[in-house]
Amino acid sequence: MGLSPNATTAGPRLPRPLVAPAATGILDPRTGRPVGADDRFFLEVNNELADKGFFVAATDDLITWARTGSLMWMTFGLACCAVEMMQMSMPRYDAERFGFAPRASPRQSDVMIVAGTLTNKMAPALRKVYDQMPEPRYVISMGSCANGGGYYHYSYAVVRGCDRIVPIDIYVPGCPPTAEALLYGVMLLQKKIRRTGTIER
């Protein structure tokens, strides 16, 4: 049995160096890097993992990381914005891939999405549902009517913005806002939670 001309008889093969795989996902046309690659949180985690192979984190950082990846939202669909809110959870946009899943009970929810016109009669019910949510709780105001009364701003029966009833974390403008706009609002809320933490709140 002879050796082929390409075979080498030198000692044992040396291990190949580890090479990171090529970037995948949606690329930013300006930088050529994946979208979100400049997020401070992920850069710190990636650098620490590359350095040691493991990372040490404070409990608050761990809780904040877990909370941003498992936000449960409660629907408070009051008008036509609720149609776009429902579309956000359908297969085309699939909000659950961001860890954002709907819940039927306020006691299991972290986020309330107020979508539509808030009337004076509905305001006490909105506050009651908000009070039933466990801390820390967040509110997204969706659409012009929820943000400031919208088309019905001068009506005697309409609350001119749901921020008069509950504290708002994210405002999503539009009449009605698209599902993409609401999804972007959810991603902004996740960034806000990462930035401020959950125990401090």
Swiss-Prot record:
Protein location: Cell inner membrane
Enzyme kind, highest EC tier: translocase
Cofactor note: Binds 1 [4Fe-4S] cluster.
Gene Ontology cellular component list: plasma membrane; respiratory chain complex I
Membrane topology per record: Peripheral membrane protein
Subunit text: NDH-1 is composed of 14 different subunits. Subunits NuoB, C, D, E, F, and G constitute the peripheral sector of the complex.
Protein name, per record: NADH-quinone oxidoreductase subunit B 1
